Amino acid sequence: MDNIPIIIKRRLQAEVMGPVFDEMSAQLGQEKAEDILRVAIQNAAIAEGQNFAATHSSPGQSPLRNFIDLFEQWKAGGALEVDVLHESDDQFDFNVTRCRYAEMYQEMDLGHIGHLLSCHRDGTFCQGFDDRITLQRDQTIMGGASCCTFRYRCET
């Protein structure tokens, strides 16, 4: 599945998870359904990060540099428009100015869980990829802001 753009993977996942979430909400309540989805997505993102680290890391590069090299996959097909503010072996700062993931979830009537399906993955993916990488993000387009602020740091 490496050759499938990530935005297509997320659409396919959302087509399944949307109805599952609706049923969980009906039977368990919205809050419990969100908790279950949050934990499931977090675990999937950590596992995905571990897989990417095992298959896409170059020896001799910093963990964050390996991560930066992968970032193109999330942007594939115009999925994200970004302004890179700083890029180094221990810091990667950028703003997302257009997010087709957010647009896609809105079009699918899943905007209410889009943050769980995509945004929540970003920081937890790092835990699996290399736990020295951390993300600080103060705002997201999915949350109503004009841009998403990504501030990655890596302990060396």
Question: What spans do the regions from the language model cover?
Answer:
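A helicase ATPase "motif cassette" and its flanking acidic/Ser/Thr-rich regulatory loops
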Residues: 94
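N-terminal accessory segment detector
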Residues: 1-91, 100-118, 123, 132-147, ...
